[in-house]
């Protein structure tokens, strides 16, 4: 009898679960553009309908939003919060049936929760370790860990009709968890993840991925815009439907260090967010216009430590409707897409351009009316057709173009960026923190780097406390830039002076002078230059002792031992580098970035207060002579 009763209970539970697993039909999901999303901060579980409905009703994608799990599925507050989530979503779908809601699941880490089995913790030297303040890593190599997460997603998320699928944070397109999750709800569960950048695989099992702050890395010179856009368009084209790939980015001038935010109270965080809201609309426009080149979503907020701020911009309200077709690349390097309600142009190049439209239009961002618009580097605009009279005043002139100047030239760009151009086609760009963000040759990115990557033993990274300086001297014979300031990580400090001298014959010398202002305990102090694989594959690299050809496909991590003189020959260009420290060459694709890395290590370990050291690099760029 007990056996029969138990069987009946199991059958009844199965019937009930099957009923709750019923998913709504997502085949008709097709919200108009722009498609705005919120990562982690929608507050469906903490806000009342009256408090949040005006904002929620304008969103097309909500990630997390009140139901965010990190091995704390049994927390006593979840039932009450979940009830509010379900109520708000039910009301939201009545006014906004296109919105998709994906609860957040963290597979890789948990708070110090006694409910987590001890053997699940990931250990280093026998101790738990943290990759995020207040969290400890989980050993995701254990199949039982993945099975636990899959089972919870099946019952607690896909078992609730209010949710459309799941979002896995800090997770890539693996061969176990993602494919099994994609099978839930008869293969109709929406599956999205955040792999840090847009991966190059996983299309068959995923509806989309989060491009978290990759737009910021484009601006920083760490990611090529064309490569990023190609990956984004592929995800919106080839992934499962409905597409949920989303671009999210932050103001360039906001501190994105999680250890910094971890020390702030709520009021301090909110004050920073409010100041940042209108501090960098240009990055917002670049991200939004890039997202509009494909069928994905966009979000702009205060960064990884305060993701999901409720910021809204006039561009979000542009009535674009739906696209007439795919985006197209223009001859000047810009991309353009036409919609029912207007045209979007994005300039992901390193130079200002003049966009020309067929019909008289109004720039949503500036209010300017006409057919010709100056579009700065790393910017985007939405143009709506109008019968308004054209703006009579001339538009701003382009500040830097692909055409080299006749003599050495200095230009000041957005966000404190300083550009130095030579008559031969070399250009250097320094940001407000004295970092050499771009080395450009004949209008194309050549390399990035030079600035130190430095961490103390706790893995906290050095960041600038204060920096001053800029152009010290400028003449036809040379341009000299000088910066000085302090770098800090927790209580450890380093004072520095940086100088850069640029000559008209396409030579520049970059020098750093450092002084340990306190005792230092360094995990790493590294200077590097990144060489994009797309440009340098099959290039010849030589030192005084060895010569190699850079492999098109990843083979060995180590490519060249340390040397102070390095020559790189690629296509029609030759680079010669002379340095006070030795540089080794590694294939950084082993660590997930498509670049070869020249790395130098001037100091390491324990460094006494007052210790001084210098790093000087001279680089000459020249057109390679044609073979006879």
Regions found by a protein language model. Give the residues of each.
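Acidic (Asp/Glu-rich), glycine- and aromatic
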Residues: 494, 507-547
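Beta-strand-rich N-terminal accessory domains
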Residues: 395-460, 556, 563-574, 579, ...
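Bacterial N-terminal signal peptides
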Residues: 8-19
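Extended, loop-rich substrate-binding clefts of extracytoplasmic carbohydrate-active enzymes
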Residues: 455-517, 521
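Short, exposed beta-strand/loop patches in secreted or surface proteins that constitute
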Residues: 326-328, 335-336, 408-412, 418-420, ...
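Beta-strand-rich recognition/accessory modules
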Residues: 421, 446-463, 486-488, 521, ...
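Glycan-processing catalytic domains of CAZymes
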Residues: 24-396
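N-terminal secretory signal peptides that target proteins for export/translocation
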Residues: 1-5
């Amino acid at each position: 009898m007990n056996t029969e009763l138990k069987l009946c209970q199991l059958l009844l539970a199965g019937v009930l679960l099957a009923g709750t697993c019923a998913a709504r039909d997502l085949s008709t999901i097709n919200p108009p553009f722009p498609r705005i999303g919120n990562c982690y901060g929608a507050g469906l579980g903490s806000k009342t309908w009256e408090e949040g409905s005006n904002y929620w009703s304008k969103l097309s994608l909500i990630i997390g939003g009140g139901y965010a799990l990190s091995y704390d599925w049994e927390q006593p507050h979840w039932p009450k919060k979940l009830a509010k989530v379900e109520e708000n979503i039910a009301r939201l779908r009545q006014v906004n049936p296109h919105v998709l809601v994906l609860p957040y699941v963290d597979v890789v880490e948990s708070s110090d929760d006694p409910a987590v089995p001890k053997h699940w913790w990931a250990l280093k030297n026998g101790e738990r370790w943290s990759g995020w303040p207040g969290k400890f890593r989980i050993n995701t190599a254990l199949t039982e860990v993945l099975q636990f997460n899959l089972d919870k997603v099946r019952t607690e998320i896909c078992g609730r009709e209010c949710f459309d699928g799941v979002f896995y944070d800090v997770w890539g397109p693996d061969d176990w968890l993602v494919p099994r999750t994609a099978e839930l709800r008869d293969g109709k569960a929406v599956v999205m993840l955040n792999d840090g950048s847009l991966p190059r695989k996983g299309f068959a099992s995923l509806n989309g991925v989060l491009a978290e702050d990759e737009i910021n890395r484009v601006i920083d010179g760490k990611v090529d815009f064309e490569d990023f856009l190609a990956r984004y368009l592929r995800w919106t084209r080839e992934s499962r439907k409905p597409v949920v790939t989303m671009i999210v980015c932050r103001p360039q001038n906001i501190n994105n260090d999680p250890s910094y935010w971890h020390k702030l109270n709520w009021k301090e965080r909110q004050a920073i967010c409010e100041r940042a809201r209108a501090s960098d609309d240009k990055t917002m426009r670049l991200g939004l216009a890039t997202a509009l080149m494909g069928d994905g979503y966009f979000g702009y907020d205060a960064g990884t430590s305060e993701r999901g701020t409720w910021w809204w911009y006039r561009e979000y309200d542009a009535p674009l409707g739906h696209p007439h077709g795919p985006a197209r690349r223009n001859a000047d390097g810009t991309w353009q897409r036409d919609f029912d309600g207007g045209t979007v142009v994005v300039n992901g190049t390193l130079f200002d351009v003049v966009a020309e439209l067929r019909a008289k239009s109004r720039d949503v961002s500036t209010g300017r009316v006409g057919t010709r618009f100056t579009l700065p580097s790393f910017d985007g605009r939405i143009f709506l057709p109008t019968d308004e009279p054209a703006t009579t005043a001339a538009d701003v002139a382009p500040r830097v173009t692909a055409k080299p100047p006749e003599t050495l030239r200095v230009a000041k760009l957005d966000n404190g960026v300083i550009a130095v151009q030579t008559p031969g086609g070399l250009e250097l760009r320094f940001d407000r923190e004295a970092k050499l963000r771009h080395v450009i040759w004949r209008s194309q990115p050549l390399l990035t780097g030079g600035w130190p990557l430095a961490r103390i033993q706790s893995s906290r990274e050095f960041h600038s406390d204060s920096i001053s300086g800029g152009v010290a001297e400028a003449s036809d014979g040379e341009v000299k830039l000088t910066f000085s300031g302090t770098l800090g990580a927790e209580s450890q400090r380093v004072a520095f002076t940086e100088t850069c001298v640029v000559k008209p014959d396409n030579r520049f010398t970059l020098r750093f002078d450092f002084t340990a202002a306190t005792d230092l305990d360094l995990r790493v102090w590294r200077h590097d230059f990144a060489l994009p694989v797309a440009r340098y594959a099959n290039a010849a690299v030589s030192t005084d002792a060895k010569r190699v050809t850079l492999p098109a496909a990843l083979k060995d991590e180590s490519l060249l031992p340390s040397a102070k003189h390095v020559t790189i020959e690629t296509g029609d260009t030759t680079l010669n580098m002379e340095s006070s420290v030795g540089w080794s060459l590694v294939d950084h694709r082993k660590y997930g970035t498509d670049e070869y890395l020249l790395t130098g290590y001037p100091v390491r370990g324990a460094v006494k207060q007052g210790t001084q050291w210098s790093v000087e690099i001279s680089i000459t760029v020249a057109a390679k002579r044609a073979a006879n």
